[in-house]
């Protein structure tokens, strides 16, 4: 659901970054849109996460925010990667537990996350055990859709034989 579809936006906070939109993970470029009191409260965290990005990040951010055309390409790229891996994982009994609007797959592995992740690592596939994200993440793994399409296809072939 879009925040624009919510009539009473009193408790709505929108975080928008270039991480997903433009595949600029790690640049920490984005914005928060919320009621003034919420934005004011969030400012207390600003010194902890930095005060201003480097100039090259600012320039790249301006270019990315100014160009909407590339966003469709980025979405299509992630969709192809998702469509390559997800059917294999579902066929092997894993359950998708996350949103479709992400550049990762959050999957219920039906058991402990670290041994599952270690098993995949032995075959060259790196996933994040859900336990790395806190106790509530136990039993899940995170497949980031950041490798190339060819690497996702190789991973799908490995997953078919390993799981």
Regions found by a protein language model. Give the residues of each.
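PLP-dependent class I/II
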Residues: 1-163
